[in-house]
Amino acid sequence: MKILAIRGKNLASLAGDFEVDFTVEPLKNAGIFAITGSTGSGKSTLLDALCLALFDSTPRMTKARESKVELADVRNKTIAQSDSRSVLRRGTAEGYAEVDFIALTGETYRSTWTACRAGGKPSGILRSVGFRLMNLSKNTEEQGTRKELLAKVSKLIGLSFEQFNRSVLLAQGDFAVDDAALHLAVKVQRIRDISDSVRFFVGVGDQQGVLVQLALCKAQLRKNAAVVQLVP
């Protein structure tokens, strides 16, 4: 699996249309690089767009399910923070997240997540999430329900949402050795799973480092493995 482009519109801190194209310079041959910027500039939102377009969810939304926080919406309604539509920028009527990628089959696909409000107005109630999957190599659209299409995407890229989070996004603090909530056996298995996923993704992903924080991952894995080895 190789990511070719990330696009979106009106998502959280990123207003209007945006695009990151890895098929043109300076990113085409950049190798590993950093996404930097001040707080609120859209770094995390860019990663959210990637996840939404592939999985209709993000790591932050997964964590929000535990807290069950409700956010204020229009017309005195609320929306769960864990709802993927909550990423739609306030004061806008529509938004989308889109990713072009090369699947394990070698074919190029485009997955698109959309959110909109009734009547095309910022004051309209939220409509159901839309999801499309196009086979760009064959110029055909995959058919199925949103759930079926999401399952298709996971199969095409060879990673589930959980595996993607562990081996690609590597959310900060997820592998902390001093996390009391994780038993040693769970830590060991997680290290094995992540290690396998990272080797796999880098191998087929042409070492595209925009999101694969490889150096950080390897350092943390070595640290965790060293701690595990100290246990009789």
Each language-model region and where it sits:
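A short, flexible beta-alpha/helix-coil linker loop
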Residues: 28, 174-175
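Short, compositionally biased segments
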Residues: 176-185, 232
